Amino acid sequence: FKNFIVMKEDIRKMLEDVLPLVNFDSDFLFSELDSLGVTTILMTLSDAYGITLDATDATPRNLRSLDSLVALVQSKL
């Protein structure tokens, strides 16, 4: 699968398109998101990578930062 850095930039671009007001460089990403933002992220990543993400994946740890989102996607591939 894709190199971590390449995947991180791909995911950043995708998520900035659907959630332009969110700072994806933050290490406190989860605190910036409401439930709609969390759902949008999970659906966007599920569709883009053909993986299954659900409410059990929507943890503060998984949504802490862009790096943790990339790790989550890679763990499902």
Where in the sequence are the language-model features?
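Phosphopantetheine carrier-protein modules
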Residues: 14-33, 50-59
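Phosphopantetheine-attachment site and its flanking helix in carrier
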Residues: 31-48
